[in-house]
Amino acid sequence: MPISQEVAYWSVVEQAKAIKEGKFTSRELLELTIERIESVNPELNAVVTMDLDLARKLADEADAKLKAGAVVGPLHGIPITVKDALETAGIRSTGGATELHNHVPDRDAPVVKAVKEAGAIVLGKTNLPRWSGDIQAYNDMFGTTVNPWNSDRVPGGSSGGAAAAVSAGLSSFEIGTDIGGSIRFPASFCGIYGHKPSFGVVPSTGYIDHEAGGTTEADVNVIGPMARSAEDLELLLELMLRKEGPLVASLAEPPEDVTSLKVAAWLDDPFCPIDAQVASVLEAAVKNLENTGLSVDREARPDIDP
């Protein structure tokens, strides 16, 4: 019996829990996702490459492991797409550039490897602007991705296909990239959650920018999760965090007494005005910080030229 369409919009945490409890199988969730893609993607144009034979094989293997009583990861059997700026072993990875239209990597970007090791199943790739260089999702190979809420609008960019896929229930979560808003803009435009991590805490090799491979760490780009809940972001970021190497973050534990912390609140700026509704949400967040006893400075600004 097919599972409810509503399951396609559940959080990753909810979907993974249901699979482990036997409420539905990984294969059933995958087939629901494929059904959603076949129904919605012709207009949405978010998912641009798929390997469904491999995805089905991996979903069946995931179900067999669970049936055998194997210890499984927190993302066991979860079907996902990945932004086409990241290398995925055995699945075409182009960066939105015609020069790489036949590029099929033999290895995964470390963040892709991390979520796969946690049990996720990569079924395909999502659209983006050429070399991730725009605030929309269009390129000469795959065309334009539209906003799932209004096809006359853009989904944002550069992780526009990723955000649209998550919002429309075509992927349980996504992995985006961000320099100047490429996770945050599309997450906002499509009504989902996105997080740009601090520099260095998530490995950025395997990112496709003007070349295949991405063997060096990006100097300004970061990679982060996109999902349908804040709880999912927490889980996914923990899985993506750098585990080894010279750039492993050594962050101090949060102090027990938060009143020793000082927060700079930069809520608006004449060079970048924001909507009143956004301002009210930010102001409420600052008020919550003040209510916990933190010191808030509303005048502090970074030492940069406007």
Task: List the model feature ranges, each with a label.
Residues S26-L30, D60, V248, A276-P302:
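Acyltransferase
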Residues M1-K57, N291-G293:
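An N-terminal boundary/leader segment
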